[in-house]
Amino acid sequence: MGAYDGAEAPRAAPASTAANSRPSRLLLLHSLLLRLVAVVVSILVIAVMVHAKQRVMIFKAEWDNSKAFVALVAISAICLGYSFLQFILSAFHLCSKSWKSPTKCWAWMNFIADQILTYAMLGAAAAAAELAYIAKNGSSRAQWQPICSTFNTFCTRAGASIILSFIAVLALANSSAISAYHLFRRPSSSV
């Protein structure tokens, strides 16, 4: 006869809450860093694009002459505000002694907001990239001449801002993936 004699097998002791929260805290730290990257890069996108101006004789190229560049700055400002708010909330959660995983409602709100802002930033960056492509290469069908040979400084700054905006998209997309993980993960069960 064995030690258990057909009786119910003993259950393993539940894992400590500190051990269960370690991956979540690590993900929260990654999310915090991604939000910080999104904040910094969004600031750079706005600063570089707003300074994309150049005058050549009587001609002038400015970022606010294009709706695509204005949209990029506006979406970057919204992403900046949202990412900064999420950074502050994540930092507060991380530093809190009574840290808990986010509620389902909070996880859904984060997931939806992250998705919306990621796609909005991607759309604005893509529209600005298309405009930059036309500015650099022109369009023979529309009979638009390339302007970057004349407005080199303007095109360089606009291009740098567009590259930075795609970096912001990557940070927002990764942050969105973490939000999705928090929302759709299966709770760990202790058996």
Swiss-Prot record:
Record localization: Cell membrane
Question: What does the similarity note say?
Answer: Belongs to the Casparian strip membrane proteins (CASP) family.
Gene Ontology, cellular component aspect: plasma membrane
Chain positions carrying an annotated carbohydrate? 137
Task: Specify the protein's topology with respect to the membrane.
Answer: Multi-pass membrane protein
Q: Which domain of life is it from?
A: Eukaryota
Q: Which UniProt keywords apply?
A: Cell membrane, Glycoprotein, Membrane, Transmembrane, Transmembrane helix
PANTHER family xref list: CASP-LIKE PROTEIN 2C1-RELATED, CASP-LIKE PROTEIN 4A4
Q: Which residues lie on this side of the membrane: Cytoplasmic?
A: 1-25, 90-114, 179-191
Q: Subunit info?
A: Homodimer and heterodimers.
Q: Which residue spans belong to the Extracellular compartment? A: 47-68, 136-157
> What name does this protein carry?
CASP-like protein 2U3
- Residues spanning the membrane: 26-46, 69-89, 115-135, 158-178
Q: Which InterPro entries match?
A: CASP/CASPL (IPR006459), CASP_dom (IPR006702)
